[in-house]
C-alpha cells in the first residue's frame, strides 16, 4: 500500500484538503478515467489515512454525510493530549478533552430529521475543521458478503435504477476492508485494489446519490434506501460494510466466540489457532521465491519475454493472522471503527462462504449468528436495533421434480435453516426489531443471482412495516413475516401441517403445491404430494371445500412418514407463499445430520475423508439420481395402472362402435 497524501502536523491544511476531497474530488474524482486508473500501482492507494496528526476526526464524519435523527449524536477523533475540542452542529455545541492516547469524544443531543444542509465545526486549540452539506435522517448499515456488495449497475433492471437515481437526500458510503485487529476507530479513504477485478475501487468517501455515484454501490442497499426515502421523505444514509467471500465468524467479535461453550465453535477456533501458530513467514517467502523462479524459467523456456517490472518476492506476508475470514477479523476492521455511531438499523445478507463445513459448520453458524446480531446491536448502542436477516440466496442448477433428491444433499439449506432458526428464536421471544427476508425463490443458477431489485424491496417492506409503520397498518406483519407452522400431526399415512395463515402458490400460479419432502424413520426422503386439507364438505356447486391454512403431505413411497423438509436444496423447487406472497422459509422437523442422511442410508459406511471423499460424494449423488429415476418409474407405472382400465374400456367401446358401423354399412350395401 502507498499513501499519496499523508497527513502532516499542519492539521488545518489537511482537513481543508479533506473537505475538498469530499466536495470537489467526490464530484469529479469519482468519474476517474480508465487511463488514470491504469497509472495507479496494483495496490491500495491511500488518499486520506485513518488517523492523522494534530486535530482530526474519524473519517466516518465527513462532508455529505447523514447524521442519525432522534438519537444522541456521538463524534470522535484525535488531538494533542489535554487539548480541548468543541463540536458545533445544528445550534448545539459540546466540549471534549483529548486523553493521553489523543482520543476525544463529544456528544450532541438528539436532533429531528432535516433536509436542510448544515455545517459541523470541530474546533481545537489552533485548528478548525468544517464538514459541510450534512443532513439529519436515518442511517442504515448494509452487511454481509458479495451478494450484498454486488453492484447496482450489474443486476436485472439495474440500469433503470441507476438512470433514475438523482436523490440528493440519499447519501452513500462504501467502507474499505480495514486492517483487521490493527484497526482504529476510523478507516482509510482510498482507491482499494482488487486482484479479483483487476482494478481499483474508491472506498471510504460519503457521496451524494446520483447515477454516477450509485452505479457501483450495493444493489440491494440502493433499492432498499431508495424505497425508504420515497416512502418517508427522510434523508437516508447508507453505509455498505459488506466484503465478498466472508463468513459469519469473521463478522463476530473474537471475544464473543471464545465465550461460546459448544464443540463446533471451539473446534473452529482451535483450527484457526493452530494455523496461526504453525505459520512461518520466512518459509512462506522461500516458497514464493521458488515459485517465482519456476515461473520465470518456464517463460524463458517457452521463449516468452519477461515482464519489465517483474521482481522476485521480497516481503514477508502476515499469513492467517491477517486472513479476512479469521474469526473476528472483519468485525475488528470494519464494524469496530463504527462503534458508537447512532444508526437506525442493519440489513445482513451472507452465507455462501459458510457452505463448506458440513453439518458441523452449520451448527457452528447457528451457535454464532444470534450472538453476532447481539454484538452489532451493542456496537451501535441499541439492544433493540432493527436487524433484517436476508437468507442465503440460490446457486447451482434448480431442483426439479425429476431431479429432486440429489440437490437435497447440500450444506446450503442447513445454513438457511440456521438463519431462519435464529430469526424465529428472536422473533418468538418478543424481539420486535428482528426481520427476515428469503431470496431462494428467485431461482437463479449463478451464485451471484442478479435479481437484487426485488430482494432490496423485500427488506424495504420489512422496514416500512416495522420501523416506519407505513405499510399494512394492523396487518403490517403480513407484508414481510414468513408463514410459520403451528401444529404437526401424523394422520393416516400423511403429515398434516397447520399454518399461521393461508398458503397459496407464488403469483397465484396454477398447478401443484410444491416444496416439501417427507421421510419415514429410515431417513429416505421423497418429494411430497402437497394438498390443502378438506374434510369432505362441498359447496353449492358440489366443489370440495379446502382449508388453505392446513397442508397435507403424502407420498406412496413413504407409507409411514415421520418428518418433513421444506425448500431443502441450494436452489429449491417450491412455490408456497402466504397470501401476501411471502415465501415459506427453509425448515425441517428432523435433526438428522447431512453425513447421516443420505450417506448412511445409501452407502455402506460414513463418507470417507481426504482424497476419497470427492469420489464417494460423486457415487452418492449417482445413487440419488438412481433413486429419483426409480421413483419416476414407479410414478409412471402408477399412472399407467390408473389410466389403463379406463383406456381399455374406452378402447373396447370404440372397437364395438366401429364394428357396429361396419355392420351397418354392410347391411346397407346388401339392400
Question: Can you describe what each PLM-predicted range is?
Answer:
Residues 1-11:
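Short, Lys/Arg-enriched N-terminal segments with co-localized hydrophobic residues
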Residues 10-20:
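Bacterial N-terminal signal peptides that target proteins for export
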Residues 19-29:
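Bacterial N-terminal signal peptides
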Residues 34-624, 629:
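Cell-envelope and extracellular/periplasmic
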Residues 613-671:
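Extended amphipathic alpha-helical heptad-repeat regions
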Amino acid at each position: 500500500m502507498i499513501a499519496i497524501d499523508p497527513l502532516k502536523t499542519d492539521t488545518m491544511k489537511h482537513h481543508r484538503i479533506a473537505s475538498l476531497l469530499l466536495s470537489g474530488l467526490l464530484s469529479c474524482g469519482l468519474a476517474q478515467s480508465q487511463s488514470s486508473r491504469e497509472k495507479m500501482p496494483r495496490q491500495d492507494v491511500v488518499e486520506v489515512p485513518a488517523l492523522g496528526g494534530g486535530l482530526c476526526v474519524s473519517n466516518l464524519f465527513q462532508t455529505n454525510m447523514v447524521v442519525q435523527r432522534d438519537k444522541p449524536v456521538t463524534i470522535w477523533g484525535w488531538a494533542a493530549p489535554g487539548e480541548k475540542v468543541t463540536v458545533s452542529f445544528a445550534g448545539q455545541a459540546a466540549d471534549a478533552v483529548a486523553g493521553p492516547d489523543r482520543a476525544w469524544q463529544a456528544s450532541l443531543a438528539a436532533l429531528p430529521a432535516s433536509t436542510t444542509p448544515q455545517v459541523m465545526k470541530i474546533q481545537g486549540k489552533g485548528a478548525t475543521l468544517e464538514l459541510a452539506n450534512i443532513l439529519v435522517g436515518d442511517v442504515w448499515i448494509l452487511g454481509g458478503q458479495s451478494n450484498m456488495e454486488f453492484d447496482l449497475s450489474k443486476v436485472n433492471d439495474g440500469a433503470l435504477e441507476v438512470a433514475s437515481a438523482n436523490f440528493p437526500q440519499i447519501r452513500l458510503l462504501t467502507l474499505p476492508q480495514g486492517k483487521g485487529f490493527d484497526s482504529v476507530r476510523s478507516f482509510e479513504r482510498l482507491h482499494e485494489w482488487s486482484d479479483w477485478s483487476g482494478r481499483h475501487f474508491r472506498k471510504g468517501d460519503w457521496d451524494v446519490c446520483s447515477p454516477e455515484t450509485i452505479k457501483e454501490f450495493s444493489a440491494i442497499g440502493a433499492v432498499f434506501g431508495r424505497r425508504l426515502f420515497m416512502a418517508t421523505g427522510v434523508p437516508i444514509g447508507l453505509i455498505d460494510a459488506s466484503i465478498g467471500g466472508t463468513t459469519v465468524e469473521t463478522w463476530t467479535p473474537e471475544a464473543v466466540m471464545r465465550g461460546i461453550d459448544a464443540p463446533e465453535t471451539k473446534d473452529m477456533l482451535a483450527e484457526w489457532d493452530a494455523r496461526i501458530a504453525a505459520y512461518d513467514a520466512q518459509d512462506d517467502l522461500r516458497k514464493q521465491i521458488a515459485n517465482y523462479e519456476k515461473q520465470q524459467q518456464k517463460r524463458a523456456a517457452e521463449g516468452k519475454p519477461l515482464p519489465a517490472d517483474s521482481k522476485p518476492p521480497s516481503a514477508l506476508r502476515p499469513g492467517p493472522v491477517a486472513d479476512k475470514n479469521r474469526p473476528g477479523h472483519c468485525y475488528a476492521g470494519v464494524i469496530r471503527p463504527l462503534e458508537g455511531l447512532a444508526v437506525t438499523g442493519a440489513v445482513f445478507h451472507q452465507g455462501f462462504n459458510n457452505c463448506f463445513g458440513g453439518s458441523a459448520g452449520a451448527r457452528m453458524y447457528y451457535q454464532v449468528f444470534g450472538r453476532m446480531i447481539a454484538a452489532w446491536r451493542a456496537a451501535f448502542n441499541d439492544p433493540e436495533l432493527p436487524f433484517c436477516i436476508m437468507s442465503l440466496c440460490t446457486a447451482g442448477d434448480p431442483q426439479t421434480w425429476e431431479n429432486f433428491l440429489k440437490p437435497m444433499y447440500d450444506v446450503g439449506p442447513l445454513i438457511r435453516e440456521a438463519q431462519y432458526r435464529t430469526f424465529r428464536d428472536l422473533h418468538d421471544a418478543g424481539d420486535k426489531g428482528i426481520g427476515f427476508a428469503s431470496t431462494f425463490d428467485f431461482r437463479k443458477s449463478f451464485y451471484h443471482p442478479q435479481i437484487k431489485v426485488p430482494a432490496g424491496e423485500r427488506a424495504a417492506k420489512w422496514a416500512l412495516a416495522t420501523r416506519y409503520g407505513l405499510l399494512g397498518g394492523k396487518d403490517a406483519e403480513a407484508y414481510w413475516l414468513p408463514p410459520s407452522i403451528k401444529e404437526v400431526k401424523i394422520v393416516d399415512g400423511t403429515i398434516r401441517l397447520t399454518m399461521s395463515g393461508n398458503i397459496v402458490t407464488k403469483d397465484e400460479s396454477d398447478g401443484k403445491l410444491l416444496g416439501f419432502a417427507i421421510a419415514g424413520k429410515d431417513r429416505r426422503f421423497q418429494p411430497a404430494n402437497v394438498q390443502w386439507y378438506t374434510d369432505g364438505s362441498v359447496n353449492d356447486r358440489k366443489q370440495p371445500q379446502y382449508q388453505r391454512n392446513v397442508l397435507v403431505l403424502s407420498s406412496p413411497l413413504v407409507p409411514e412418514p415421520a418428518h418433513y423438509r421444506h425448500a431443502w436444496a441450494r436452489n429449491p423447487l417450491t412455490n408456497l407463499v402466504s397470501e401476501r406472497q411471502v415465501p415459506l422459509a427453509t425448515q425441517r422437523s428432523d435433526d438428522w445430520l447431512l453425513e447421516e442422511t443420505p450417506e448412511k442410508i445409501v452407502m455402506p459406511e460414513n463418507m470417507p475423508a481426504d482424497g476419497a471423499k470427492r469420489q464417494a460424494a460423486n457415487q452418492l449423488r449417482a445413487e440419488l439420481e438412481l433413486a429419483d429415476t426409480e421413483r419416476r418409474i414407479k410414478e409412471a407405472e402408477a399412472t399407467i395402472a390408473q389410466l389403463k382400465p379406463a383406456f381399455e374400456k374406452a378402447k373396447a367401446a370404440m372397437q364395438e362402435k366401429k364394428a357396429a358401423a361396419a355392420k351397418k354399412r354392410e347391411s346397407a350395401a346388401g339392400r
